């Protein structure tokens, strides 16, 4: 389990531009659990209606899997799809009412020329027999999964009123091999684990990846200089910048919401404290000054304050301090161990690794109604490193199963968990990236 201090041996790092890399071994993905109260929706297969080569991506399968793993929806199994309309005029609503479906998605894929495809799809309210959404998107073959995720986002938002977060990316660290032959990699993949690509390879562990708010860079910890150092790396080009290599600990980087500052934990004065660095001038502002260990900073959504882990009260708990410094206030009071906070986009929810004895689970404190209420999101015994999706509908975290590291993405109501497992080795240190924008 990750404790407030977790600094490892020196690194030898190979830096790799994203565009120049072959994809590494991917993650095996499966969905665990479900909920009878999830909204029923039929996502009908979308056939290819063209004369050329059909795309390899099964658009409807990707859309359905996205909706399933959100915990908000339950898609109709393929064996129960008794009719296969491809457009609204072909939908027999009584059929889907009989099958007790609230919504139905239909569509088709067509040849758009020059190696591109056009996807047209529609969303209907089954009870009312009314169309809620009708859109068309065009993309090349290698972007069809992106299109599918964007379709799922639009459907999710139209029904729930909440922006979808399927077309996003996650970062994580993999570890494979044994003993002196261990190898590590900082990876970026789609939010469902597909399309993994390597950002950094290393002969020693890598730590604490953190996304810039525009999704273009990652901050992370490296030991290649003989001491922990913090780097910023451009995901597309592989270009990187050393931003912190003070004597002692340089750890736990966290981008501010405007991307102009970096919160970090430094022990340059002897004890680990929370600092903020202006990334333009590289000027440091020390926020905490306490004999306890202060680490794992993460920003409040408005950029006005920073949450962090501290054992100043005797055991690790979450505290909050103004981004300009000052006195810190304790935030968590339930349990003897709360660490590695992740804060939702609206600041109302905080996910933490919560410990009791030798058991560590992911818990969430919800302040939406004023007084904080707690819920447990994970069932494991060694769960850590929670990271909210940008819409706070899911939480990504690391777990130990059978002596190896895996990732889970759990819906924020704990209805559904998606497991992401490396076929040969461990996966750890997850970080959910920001919303993406189409160019």
Curated annotation (Swiss-Prot):
Compartments reported by the entry: Periplasm
Q: Which residues does UniProt assign to the signal peptide?
A: 1-22
Q: Can you cite a GO biological process for this protein?
A: protein import
The source's superkingdom equals Bacteria
| One Gene Ontology cellular component | periplasmic space
Could you confirm whether the keyword Cell cycle appears in this record?
A: yes
List the InterPro entries: 6-blade_b-propeller_TolB-like, PD40, Tol-Pal_TolB, TolB_N
Q: How does it assemble?
A: The Tol-Pal system is composed of five core proteins: the inner membrane proteins TolA, TolQ and TolR, the periplasmic protein TolB and the outer membrane protein Pal. They form a network linking the inner and outer membranes and the peptidoglycan layer.
- Please explain the role this protein plays, according to its UniProt record: Part of the Tol-Pal system, which plays a role in outer membrane invagination during cell division and is important for maintaining outer membrane integrity.
Q: Which family does it belong to?
A: Belongs to the TolB family.
- Which NCBIfam families has this protein been placed in? propeller_TolB
What name has this protein been given in UniProt?
Answer: Tol-Pal system protein TolB
Q: Which gene encodes it?
A: tolB
């Amino acid at each position: 389990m990750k404790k407030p201090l977790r600094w490892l041996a020196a690194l030898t790092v190979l830096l790799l531009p994203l565009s120049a890399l072959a994809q590494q071994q991917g993650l095996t993905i499966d969905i665990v659990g479900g909920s009878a109260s999830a909204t029923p929706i039929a996502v009908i297969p979308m056939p290819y209606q063209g004369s050329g080569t059909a795309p390899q991506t099964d658009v409807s399968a990707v859309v359905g899997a996205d909706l399933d793993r959100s915990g908000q929806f339950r898609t109709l199994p393929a064996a129960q799809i008794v009719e296969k309309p491809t457009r609204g005029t072909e939908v027999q609503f009584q059929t889907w009412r009989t099958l007790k479906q609230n919504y139905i998605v239909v569509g088709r894929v067509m040849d758009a020329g020059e190696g591109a495809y056009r996807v047209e799809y529609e969303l209907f309210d089954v009870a009312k027999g009314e169309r809620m959404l009708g859109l068309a998107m065009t993309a090349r073959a290698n972007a069809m999964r992106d299109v599918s995720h964007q379709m799922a986002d639009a459907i999710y938002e139209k029904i729930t009123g909440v922006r979808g977060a399927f077309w996003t990316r996650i970062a994580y660290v993999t570890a494979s091999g044994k003993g002196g032959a261990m190898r590590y990699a900082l990876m970026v993949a789609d939010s469902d684990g597909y399309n993994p690509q390597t950002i950094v390879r290393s002969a020693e562990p890598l730590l604490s990846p953190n996304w810039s708010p525009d999704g273009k860079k990652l901050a992370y910890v490296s030991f290649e200089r003989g001491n922990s150092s913090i780097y910023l790396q451009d995901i597309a080009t592989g270009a990187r910048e050393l931003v912190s290599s003070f004597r002692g600990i340089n750890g736990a980087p966290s981008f501010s919401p405007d991307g102009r500052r970096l919160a970090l934990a430094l022990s340059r004065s002897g004890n680990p404290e929370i600092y903020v660095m202006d990334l333009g001038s590289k000027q440091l502002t020390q926020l905490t000054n306490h004999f306890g260990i202060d680490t794992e900073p993460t920003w409040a959504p408005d950029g006005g304050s920073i949450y962090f882990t501290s054992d100043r009260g005797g055991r690790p708990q979450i505290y909050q301090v103004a981004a300009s410094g000052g006195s810190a206030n304790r935030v968590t009071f339930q349990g003897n161990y709360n660490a590695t906070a992740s804060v939702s986009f609206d600041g109302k929810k905080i996910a933490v690794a919560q410990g009791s004895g030798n058991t560590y689970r992911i818990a969430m404190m919800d302040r939406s109604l004023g007084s904080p209420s707690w819920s447990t999101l994970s069932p494991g015994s060694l769960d850590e490193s929670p990271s909210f999706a940008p819409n706070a509908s899911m939480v990504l975290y690391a777990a130990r199963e059978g002596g190896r590291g895996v990732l889970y993405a759990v819906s924020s109501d704990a209805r559904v968990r998606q497991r992401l497992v490396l076929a040969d080795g461990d996966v750890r240190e997850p970080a959910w990236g920001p919303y993406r924008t189409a160019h």
